[in-house]
């Protein structure tokens, strides 16, 4: 079933987040998905958008040759950086696109990049878990949410949290970031 979906008509690449955005943890079929993409030469972009608000993300890129690109935004771990649109992209091979062009002609927003670098220098990848772990556990407990590896997501049930279903049957991801304000 999964192979049929991944090999869908016109599929030229796969974008997958880690942790997976719908579950708040690494996708349960991540290994299988990567094997299928490798076997069928489907290039993968690994989106680490939740990197700075997640734990247990350990991916050895050497184990997954289909992963050709890794991206990471700094907007989720660092409040206010969403206004600066700053992140990092790593590619195995040169990509002739708008990002490369802006970098080559030195038109990237240096102020935003410098701000992102300062945040990374001053806050560890574990900062948000260290700061919000206790509040996260309390909010999840008070709202009957299952913990995830992403400090802003809890998983609910179909009775109280049906409105939070994002398309995966039986999955109800609840964003609790507003309840974590300190």
Q: For each predicted feature, which ranges?
A:
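PLP-dependent class I/II
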Residues: 1-182
């Amino acid at each position: 079933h999964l192979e049929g979906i991944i090999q869908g008509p016109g599929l030229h690449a796969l974008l997958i987040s880690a942790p997976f955005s719908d579950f708040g943890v690494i996708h349960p079929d991540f290994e299988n998905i990567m094997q299928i993409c490798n076997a069928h030469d489907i290039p993968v972009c690994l989106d680490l958008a939740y990197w700075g608000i997640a734990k247990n993300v350990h991916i050895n890129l050497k184990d997954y040759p289909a992963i050709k690109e890794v991206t990471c935004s700094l907007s989720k771990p660092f409040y206010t950086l969403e206004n600066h649109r700053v992140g990092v992209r790593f590619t195995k091979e040169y990509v002739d696109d708008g990002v490369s062009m802006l970098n080559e002609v030195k038109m990237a927003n240096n102020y935003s990049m410098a701000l992102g670098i300062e945040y990374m220098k001053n806050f560890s990848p574990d900062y948000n878990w260290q700061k919000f772990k206790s509040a996260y556990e309390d909010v999840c407990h008070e709202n009957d949410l299952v913990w995830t590896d992403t400090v802003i997501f809890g998983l609910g049930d179909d009775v109280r949290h049906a409105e939070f279903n994002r398309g995966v049957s039986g999955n109800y991801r609840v964003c609790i970031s507003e309840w974590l304000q300190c």
